[in-house]
């Protein structure tokens, strides 16, 4: 079991157990710690991206109280690993920023954060990895378009980013290498068949709940959707980006800061659009043909990325 199930959330729980807490208390404290890490990561990321502590606070509240975040704790019960993976999403992006500005220290932080994501929940790491690569690519692209950015720095950014990802896989190898080596002795077929086949869990017109108060009932997967308040907030944020932030974006005194700000806004728009698309039946061709994606099982797992 431990060769196939990401162990980090179990390690966190074990720490509290070793400190003398009961099993139930240890799980509850691990959940509390996950909330704290997620909130801090979202706050730090938004403050860095938008330069405002108020933006950080608003983002931390929105991310921490996102319906899918709550569902993983209070409804699914067995999703402590996936819950902890959401805590690492903002940390990974925050560390990715540091690859450019903090040299080798930034590379080490990205390696640690990404390894933490892999060890938290391998399926969530699979889901989030394309978005991480997109963000790194946008950073490189925008830096490359800046005449004030030396080419040697762009080369170093690429090398450090690649090295950080390789180091992250090396740090997490003790978990996923045995899992890959022993997959022949595990019955992996049933995890993508029957109830667990992705085609049974798409969301279309029911992607967003219609009541102001989120309905956490498990009937017909009602809880695996966006909340109405969350959807309205997301639409308002997208509108602000499209009609206010992007048109009025001005190059700062340091041109590279302006181009990176544009990358972040573009990343937010693309990530939200792609994550939402992957939850709907329109994405079925991708689910059928992209390797390993079927092991995600539930398209609504992209709600975790959408929440960010």
What do these predicted ranges mean?
Residues 2, 17, 29-49, 53-140, ...:
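Membrane-embedded helix bundles of polyisoprenyl
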Residues 90, 131-132, 168, 233-238, ...:
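Hydrophobic membrane-spanning alpha-helices of multi-pass integral membrane proteins
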Residues 1-7:
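Membrane-proximal lumenal/periplasmic loop motifs of glycosylation machinery
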Residues 69-84, 190-225, 274-308:
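Membrane-helix boundary/interfacial segments in multi-pass membrane proteins
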Residues 24, 28-31, 50-53, 104, ...:
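Membrane-water interface of alpha-helical transmembrane segments
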Residues 8-33, 293:
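Juxtamembrane segments of multi-pass membrane glycosylation machinery
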Residues 143-161, 238-276, 281-285:
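Membrane-interface helix-loop-helix junctions at transmembrane boundaries of multi-pass membrane enzymes
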Residues 164-248:
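Periplasmic/ER-lumenal interhelical loops and adjacent helix-loop junctions
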């Amino acid at each position: 079991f431990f060769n196939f199930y990401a162990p980090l959330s179990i390690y966190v729980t074990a720490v509290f157990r070793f400190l003398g807490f009961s099993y139930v208390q240890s799980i509850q404290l691990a959940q509390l710690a996950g909330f704290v890490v997620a909130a801090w990561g979202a706050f730090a990321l938004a403050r860095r991206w938008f330069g405002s502590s108020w933006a950080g606070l608003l983002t931390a509240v929105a991310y921490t109280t996102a319906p899918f975040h709550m569902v993983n704790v209070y409804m699914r019960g067995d999703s402590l690993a996936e819950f902890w993976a959401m805590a690492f999403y903002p940390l990974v992006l925050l560390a990715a920023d540091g690859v450019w500005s903090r040299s080798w220290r930034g590379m080490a932080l990205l390696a640690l954060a990404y390894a933490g994501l892999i060890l938290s929940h391998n399926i969530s790491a699979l889901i989030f990895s394309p978005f991480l690569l997109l963000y790194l690519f946008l950073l490189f692209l925008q830096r490359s378009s800046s005449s004030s950015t030396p080419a040697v720095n762009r080369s170093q950014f690429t090398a450090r980013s690649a090295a950080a990802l390789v180091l992250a896989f090396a740090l997490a190898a003790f978990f996923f290498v045995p899992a890959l080596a022993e997959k022949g002795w595990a019955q992996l077929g049933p995890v993508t068949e029957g109830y667990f086949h992705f085609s049974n869990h798409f969301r279309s017109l029911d992607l967003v709940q219609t009541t102001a108060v989120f309905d956490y009932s498990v009937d017909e997967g009602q809880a695996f959707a966006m909340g109405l308040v969350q959807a309205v907030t997301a639409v308002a944020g997208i509108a602000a980006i499209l009609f206010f932030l992007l048109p009025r974006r001005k190059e700062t005194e340091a041109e590279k800061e302006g181009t990176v700000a544009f990358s972040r806004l573009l990343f937010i728009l693309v990530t939200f659009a792609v994550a939402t698309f992957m939850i709907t039946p329109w994405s079925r061709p991708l689910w059928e043909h992209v390797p390993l994606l079927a092991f995600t099982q539930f398209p609504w797992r992209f709600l975790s990325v959408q929440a960010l």
